UniProtKB/Swiss-Prot annotation:
Compartments where located: Peroxisome membrane
Note: Present with 656 molecules/cell in log phase SD medium.
GO biological process per UniProt: protein import into peroxisome matrix, docking
Membrane topology: Peripheral membrane protein
Organism classification: Eukaryota, Fungi, Dikarya, Ascomycota, Saccharomycotina
Keyword Oxidoreductase: no
Disulfides per UniProt: none
Gene Ontology cellular component terms for the protein in this record: peroxisomal importomer complex; peroxisomal membrane; transmembrane transporter complex
Keywords: Membrane, Peroxisome, Protein transport, Transport
Species: Saccharomyces cerevisiae (strain ATCC 204508 / S288c) (Baker's yeast)
Function: Component of the peroxisomal translocation machinery with PEX13 and PEX14. Interacts indirectly with the PTS1 receptor (PAS10/PEX5) and directly binds to PEX14. Required for import of both PTS1 and PTS2 proteins.
Record's protein name: Peroxisomal membrane protein PEX17
Length: 199
């Protein structure tokens, strides 16, 4: 057994200047680091799953759709070629104007009289009401002899309203657009008339 006298009585403790203080880390920084670390691990796992399983499956499906589209296109071309071989053509010049009922005369243009125009505008009703008001005012003026100042002012206001209605009326623009559409349809019909019609 070691005696008590063998231990030194005075211990030389280090000075406080040589002791380095440990700085504690901020808990917010630790939380952010942990969140980023966990997020990186999750993203890496998702990337692995997508690269190993999802991407090959999508590539296979895309290739299958591409092959199917190519197969359908080739079959359609073959069917169209076979139908064109069976189609008998007759020149338009050999046909008269509606000589046979089993032919369609594609070069016949539609007349403007056959076009049914639906007037969904409310301007006609407004113009009709204004004309009725004008007739009533004229009758009142004739019956009273001389129009009063209030009637003249009212007639002036009616003329202003009529002018505003005429300025906002777009029926002519719509009519011009419909005519342009008809002309465009006729031009398209002319493009398809290439000198041959099916028989």
């Amino acid at each position: 057994m070691t005696s008590i006298n063998s231990f030194p009585r005075n211990i030389d403790w280090p000075s406080n200047i040589g002791i380095k203080k440990i700085e504690g880390t901020n808990p917010t920084v630790n939380a952010i680091k942990g969140l980023l670390y966990n997020g990186g691990s999750i993203y890496a796992f998702l990337y692995f799953v997508i690269a190993m399983f999802v991407e090959p499956t999508l590539q296979k499906q895309y290739q299958q759709r591409n092959d199917f589209s190519l197969f359908v296109l080739l079959r359609l071309r073959r069917i169209i070629a076979q139908l064109q071989k069976r189609l008998v053509m007759t020149p338009v010049s050999s046909l008269g104007f509606n000589e046979q009922n089993n032919f369609v005369e594609r070069s016949t243009q539609t007349s403007d009289d056959n076009i049914i125009r639906e007037d969904n505008s409310h301007w006609a009703e407004m113009i009709y009401q204004l004309q009725n008001m004008k007739q009533e005012l004229q009758y009142f003026n004739r019956s009273s002899g001389q129009p009063s100042e209030s009637i003249d002012d009212f007639v002036f206001q009616i003329k202003m309203v009529t002018d505003q209605v005429e300025l906002t009326d777009r029926s002519r623009a719509f009519s011009n657009k419909s005519r342009n559409i008809i002309q465009g349809i006729r031009e398209i019909k002319g493009w398809f008339v290439n000198g041959q019609v099916p028989r």
